[in-house]
Amino acid sequence: MLRTIVPARLEFRDGVPYSAAYGDVYHSADGGPGQARHVFLAGCGLPAAWAGRDSFVVLETGFGTGLNFLATWAAWRDDPARPSRLHFLSVEKHPFQAADLARIHAQWPEFAELSEVLRGNWPMLLPGFHRVALDGGRVQLTLMLGEAAECLHEVEARVDAFYLDGFAPDRNTDLWQPQLFETLAWLANPGATAATYTVAAPVLQGLTQAGFACEKRRGYGRKRHCMSARFAGRSRAEVSAAPRHVAVIGGGVAGAAAARALVDRGVSVTLLERATAPAEGASGNPVAVFRPLISRDDNRATRLTRAAFLHDLRAWAALGECVQWARCGVLHLARDAATAAKQQQALAEIALPADYARWVDLGEARELAHWSVAAPGTFYSAAGWVVPGSLCRAWLDHPGIGLQTNRAVGRLQAVSNGWQILDREGHALAEADAVVLANARDASRLALGQAWPLHTVRGQVTQLPAGSLPEIARVIAREGYVAPGAAGPLVGATYEHPEGYKENDDDTAPRAASDVANLARLEAILPGATQRFVSNEVSGRASLRATLPDRLPLVGAVDGQPGLYVAAGYASRGVVWAGLLGEALADLITGQPLPLEAELMRGIAPARFAGNRKTA
């Protein structure tokens, strides 16, 4: 079940932020910025330690007021020798609301600009990992909301510096456990540093037993000592060098997002698309609906969709006006009275933030829909619609991405320095250090020896005449959806399983029967809507979705084939999942901290189907 995040309650004691829950202050009464710089940055040898590095990773055990992050970000900005990319991972059980951060940060005018940017990107307070891109993506904040031990266990990263913060050991015993120090040792890069304000014996002992060489330093202000440490233990095997050139096969949202994430990490990308332009398949629909999922058990699909949805809200805004989308809200009506009762009870138990999802009664549902709908439902105020093609074009608009269209890939050939991509006649199309298969069902054909249970499901959307439903200003769903659009409302979508057509065929010609099914969906959502137009005024568009039995995507390294990766099986959640999964795959390929929990990454990895491997 979803664990509710309880925000911190802001109090001040003598002008210093104070936690009544822990009976401790958030920083020294002698000055917060000075403490951050002396104890944590200087304690970890920063900024000198990151000089000339391509990337540098900091992990903090308590985000608190965000002071250490702001001080580190400011130091990175001010340093001409700064690394190209700064990752800052921080865990927090009780995060502040953005408005409270504004009150706290007002004490530190030197961070005013950074604070405003941070608060403008502050995530909804929901459990899990939240990847926040700042400074054009050169600074990556991964905010992990939840219990520290659980969050840190899910981190996949190689850490260069640890900020051990999070209230005094005798006030926050849940954090300062032996497991914490074991986790630090597992995550530490060779020679990683650590710093903390405390010199308590259990902390010194825990660090020492985990392989850190510790030393006391002069403390800050009235505190006599603080502590620094350097990891001298045994590290995990070093990560292979990141590829310089990656070929991405497939120009839909999965491939476009992966290509952009890779090029943003300094990798040269060639994208091969078999059609005449990107976004010609399912990614070519006039609009697509984006919204989160809710489930009582908070399963993998729910957690992945939540993380991806929240990431989209920030990332799409950063792409600018070239992305056509609207946070108009999605009203999802209950199917029947029994379903309504279950959904209302579930929402009450989960206690989600109202701006994420809330229950609305029949009267409010009718107000939101501007229609006499027949059921109450769940309202997702931050959700809405997006034009998938505009997303693809925005992601691919980068000089480091070489787009090649009309390139049908026949097979892949492993070569000494990577991979060769061949057409169906055996002619070379490209060579690359690594390859990403983002070509839906066809990924199975190119990944020799794999037997992923990818299959296609045909889906058709139906375009209504322009002006036929002028009242509809937001997406309304109920076993289907109707969405506003520039060319007229769009109704969708059919989910046609193989019993209705040949398994894995490529028939995308519109079908009258599919339009009829969509119009029946429309009538169930908006009673009387089909009387606004005649049926021969509608038009259909069909495409094929690649899906898997567990309804999760297929993202990660292909087992036994070094340098080969896959991003497929996004089904009907492609626009929601693609951005964050592209980031995750690019981080995996380049050896950077992952933006998702390790358990989620395992849940979407190709290795989960290892037992299905083909034999010769």
UniProtKB/Swiss-Prot annotation:
Which family does the UniProt entry place this protein in?
A: In the N-terminal section; belongs to the methyltransferase superfamily. tRNA (mnm(5)s(2)U34)-methyltransferase family.
Keywords carried by this UniProt record: Cytoplasm, FAD, Flavoprotein, Methyltransferase, Multifunctional enzyme, Oxidoreductase, S-adenosyl-L-methionine, Transferase, tRNA processing
- In its UniProt entry, what is this protein called? tRNA 5-methylaminomethyl-2-thiouridine biosynthesis bifunctional protein MnmC
What is this enzyme's catalytic activity, as reactions?
5-aminomethyl-2-thiouridine(34) in tRNA + S-adenosyl-L-methionine = 5-methylaminomethyl-2-thiouridine(34) in tRNA + S-adenosyl-L-homocysteine + H(+)
Q: What is its EC number?
A: 2.1.1.61, 1.5.-.-
Its biological function?
Catalyzes the last two steps in the biosynthesis of 5-methylaminomethyl-2-thiouridine (mnm(5)s(2)U) at the wobble position (U34) in tRNA. Catalyzes the FAD-dependent demodification of cmnm(5)s(2)U34 to nm(5)s(2)U34, followed by the transfer of a methyl group from S-adenosyl-L-methionine to nm(5)s(2)U34, to form mnm(5)s(2)U34.
| InterPro entries cross-referenced by the UniProt entry | FAD-dep_OxRdtase, FAD/NAD-bd_sf, MnmC-like_methylTransf, SAM-dependent_MTases_sf, tRNA_MAMT_biosynth_bifunc_MnmC, tRNA_MNMC2, tRNA_S-uridine_synth_MnmC_C
Superkingdom? Bacteria
- In its UniProt entry, the species of origin is given as Thiobacillus denitrificans (strain ATCC 25259 / T1)
Q: Where is this region: FAD-dependent cmnm(5)s(2)U34 oxidoreductase?
A: 249-616
UniProt entry tagged with the keyword Repeat = no
Q: What gene is behind this protein?
A: mnmC
Annotated GO molecular function terms are: flavin adenine dinucleotide binding; oxidoreductase activity, acting on the CH-NH group of donors; tRNA (5-methylaminomethyl-2-thiouridylate)(34)-methyltransferase activity
What are the required cofactors?
FAD
Quote any Pfam family the record assigns. Answer: DAO
Where does it reside?
Answer: Cytoplasm
Q: What GO biological process terms are annotated to this protein in UniProt?
A: methylation; tRNA wobble base modification
Cellular component GO terms, alphabetical: cytoplasm
Q: Does the keyword Flavoprotein apply?
A: yes
Region annotation (tRNA (mnm(5)s(2)U34)-methyltransferase) ranges: 1-232
